[in-house]
């Protein structure tokens, strides 16, 4: 389980996050919903160790304290991040990008076996292993980014706006793949503005407003609660 508590981030006098706390179990999808500027991306980066936080931050994964662990060591501990910009190498091929994601220190299976699992999730990538990522569509590049993160065999996968810029068809394909990843035992924490699609696949959700978590619950409860929809979801895409 990923356990996060007391995460506060400030930029000068601006408090971007205030004592954020959440949990993610392996084998579940948790979505963070909020408007632009709510602090969603800041929260993911803080969890991944990419931003300085106020004293008191706690991040634990499987009982291990990751609060002061460097980002590359966090990956080795079982936490992987797919950033909004995808973080892939556009001038390299699909195969080369996947290879860069491999983490021999977490070798529960061979690299070839793990790549076979990734290509099973995203069959289109198997047909394009020698293709340069720069020549691929946005949806295909997102698949490469997620595939590369999965090559590290994470226990928890963090995804920042994975559906951003994708067509409705590609969003459905992507979220179907995320369900399969969840069912394989990986926990997923998504930052999303696409409320309808993300809540449809999520097990639980958190509502973030002005840097504070102002609500959480089962995804079905959030979908059906009129007050929640009006107060927190009404301005988000897909609602």
Each predicted region: which residue ranges?
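Glycine-rich phosphate-binding loops of nucleotide-dependent enzymes
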Residues: 1-239
């Amino acid at each position: 389980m990923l356990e996060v508590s007391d995460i506060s981030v400030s930029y000068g006098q601006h408090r971007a996050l205030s004592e954020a706390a959440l949990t993610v179990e392996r084998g579940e999808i948790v979505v963070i919903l909020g408007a632009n500027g709510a602090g969603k991306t800041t929260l993911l980066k803080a969890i991944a160790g990419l931003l300085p936080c106020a004293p008191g931050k706690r991040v634990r994964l499987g009982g291990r304290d990751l609060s002061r662990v460097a980002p590359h060591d966090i990956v080795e501990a079982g936490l992987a991040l797919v950033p909004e910009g995808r973080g892939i190498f556009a001038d390299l091929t699909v195969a080369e990008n996947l290879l860069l994601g491999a983490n021999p220190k977490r070798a529960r299976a061979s690299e070839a076996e793990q790549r076979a699992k990734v290509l099973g999730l995203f069959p289109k990538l198997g047909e394009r292993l020698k293709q340069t990522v720069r020549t691929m569509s946005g949806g295909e590049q997102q698949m490469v980014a997620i595939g590369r993160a999965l090559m590290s065999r994470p226990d928890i996968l963090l995804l920042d706006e994975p559906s951003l810029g994708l067509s409705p068809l590609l969003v459905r394909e992507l979220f179907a793949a995320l369900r399969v990843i969840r069912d394989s035992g990986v926990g997923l924490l998504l930052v999303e503005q696409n409320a309808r699609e993300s809540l449809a696949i999520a097990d639980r959700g958190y509502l973030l407003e002005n840097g504070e978590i102002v609500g959480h619950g089962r995804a079905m409860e959030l979908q059906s609660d009129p007050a929640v929809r009006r107060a927190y979801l009404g301005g988000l895409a897909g609602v």
